[in-house]
């Protein structure tokens, strides 16, 4: 387990993380793909290089800059043509 990133808390509103010594709250409003994830998968988070974290089983990556300044990165979902099949 990489000690540079740890899950501190999981609740109904989101996830509290410690990344490189700083704490961040990830609201499910900003990361909805983590809301229905298994707790064991959410707990398995690791550094992905120096500038990002990842949840390998969930295929989710987040840049640390997004954690520091979430207001700069609005959540925009794009539909693919397969969504209509």
Question: Where are the predicted features?
Answer:
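Motif-centric detector for short Cys/His coordination patterns
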Residues: 1-85
């Amino acid at each position: 387990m990489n000690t540079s990133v740890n899950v501190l808390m999981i609740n109904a509103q989101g996830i509290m993380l410690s990344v490189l010594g700083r704490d961040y709250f990830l609201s499910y409003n900003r990361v909805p793909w983590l809301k229905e994830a298994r707790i064991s998968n959410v707990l398995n988070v690791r550094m992905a290089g120096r500038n990002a974290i990842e949840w390998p089983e969930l295929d989710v990556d987040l840049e640390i800059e997004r954690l520091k300044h979430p207001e700069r990165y609005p959540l925009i979902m794009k539909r693919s043509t397969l969504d209509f099949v």
